[in-house]
Amino acid sequence: MDYEIENNHADSIRRGSIEVICGSMFSGKTEELLRRLRRAKIARQTVEIFKPTIDIRYDETDVVSHDKNAIASTPVDNSANILLLSSQVDVVGIDEAQFFDEGLVEVAQQLADQGVRVVIAGLDMDFRRQPFGPMPGLCAIADSVTKVHAVCVECGRLASYSFRRVQGDQQVMLGELNEYSPLCRTCYRKCSSPPQTEEIHSTI
């Protein structure tokens, strides 16, 4: 259920809030973000949507889910630009928040204090299972946090982790199912362990 009822235009006072949708890759974060933003538009609220310029996997400008559902957005280089471009709106949506700078936390706080409903989606952990970008800070200040899960491709259980199947130590590497797989804790540990080699003892 959404944190805030969307069709609240009858209220004379705008009530700001911060909603965070987080989880692993392929967990439906963007899909849930799009659902909430579409409902806000149906309620005749003014909506502005942003994504980092680095995210060009499906489209250079639109926010696109893995299911290929899309909504028009504005790509921005840094979080400060979101403040500059968010005047006179009721709802601000932000996708792939993990790729933004740490200033996004303060940007979200300022927007909510101004009465804007801020809906944010992003990876909470990187491929090493470490906190990713500004997501920990955003979860800390959020009025609501929705943790969504993918399905583990190895065993079918709920998956919380994004396992990288290609070589590379850099934290940011855009990819799809060929490069990343959603895994549960047990399967992540199994896939992360170095392969066991049989010890061969020579006999005389």
UniProtKB/Swiss-Prot annotation:
Keywords: ATP-binding, Cytoplasm, DNA synthesis, Kinase, Metal-binding, Nucleotide-binding, Transferase, Zinc. Its EC number is 2.7.1.21. Belongs to the thymidine kinase family. It is an enzyme of class 2 (transferase). GO terms for biological process: DNA biosynthetic process; thymidine metabolic process. It catalyses: thymidine + ATP = dTMP + ADP + H(+). GO terms for cellular component: cytosol. Disulfide bonds: none annotated. It comes from the Bacteria. Zn(2+) binds at residues 152, 155, 184, 187. It holds the Pfam family TK. It is found in: Cytoplasm. ATP binds at residues 23-30, 95-98. The active site is at 96 (proton acceptor). It comes from Porphyromonas gingivalis (strain ATCC BAA-308 / W83). Homotetramer. This is Thymidine kinase. One of its GO terms (molecular function) is thymidine kinase activity.
